[in-house]
Each structure stands twice: as C-alpha cells, then as structure tokens.
C-alpha cells in the first residue's frame, strides 16, 4: 500500500469546518512562483501546475528507472497547495484575481534530497518536453497556525477567514502574516470533477500569541 500523506497526517489535511490550532512541522516542497489570474486559460498559473506535476510524478515513478533514491518507498503524490498574496493592498481583494502573486507547491517526502529533485527537474524537462527550470526545492517551516476546512467556492473564502479571525481573537492569538508568512490553501477536491459549492480547501494562517 502506497504511503498517503492525506491519510497519515489527517490533522494537516482534513481539519474540521471550524477553526483549530495546529503546529505544522517543517517540510520540503516542489515550488513554482508566479503572478496573475489562476483562472486564465494557458496562463502562468496553469503552466506552473503542469511543471509541478511533471516533477512530482517523475520523482514518484523514479523507482521504475535506473535512478535510485535512497530510502525510497512508494507514495501517493500529495495535494496541490498554494501560498497567496497581493502587493500594496491593505486587505485582499478576492475579485481582483489578476493582482494575485502566488507560490504553488506540492509536498515532497522527507527522503527526497535536493540532488534527487535536480535529477527530476532535468529528467522531466527532457522526457516531457516541458521546461521545468522554474521549479525550486523549497523548505517551509510554518509552525503555529490556525486552520479550517473551507467548503465551497474560493470567492466565498472571506467569510471563512472571518471565522478564523474571530476564533483567534477569542483565544488570545493574532495572525502572523507578512511577506514571508502567507495565506495558505490546500486543495482537497479536483475542481474539474466536483461542483464549486462542494470544493474542500484547507485554509491555514500562521499565528502568534496576542
């Protein structure tokens, strides 16, 4: 049975639809940075997703090649995630999607080293005829966070974020969001197959004591 991050780490991927506080350990990711409307057909975001999955599946299937990764075991590619922000605004305008900057990521198993990652980028670029040079090996240490399972369209996120903010205020915490600590989403539904009102998205913000 392949290792499935969603099942082994349910506390990070399947929170309840009410706010909760968690301590998220440091982890490594495949990451691609960009800016612009994520819904733009053939735009930077969709290109970034193609790169992420090309590298992710090259690593996942590496055991069927001559390249051997030390400590490798079979695993399910974890869900797509994203860190989002808008420059020069006091509050996020969810309707102005072209103003978003983002870092799209997919988590890596701990046994995958930077050298393994570099091999996968080179291999995916050659085999899939897709320039994967925009992918980077990124380590993220989120630490103390508030999170919730948002059900529904991304456009309805402000109401869910307001619930999170109220919960923090009631429990003696504040958001700790800045240019290095960003609004974090984990996409638990396939948007191509699930109706928008049923999309499941983990929303996570880093926090600190008030």
Language-model features: locations:
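A solvent-exposed interaction/effector surface
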Residues: 1-210
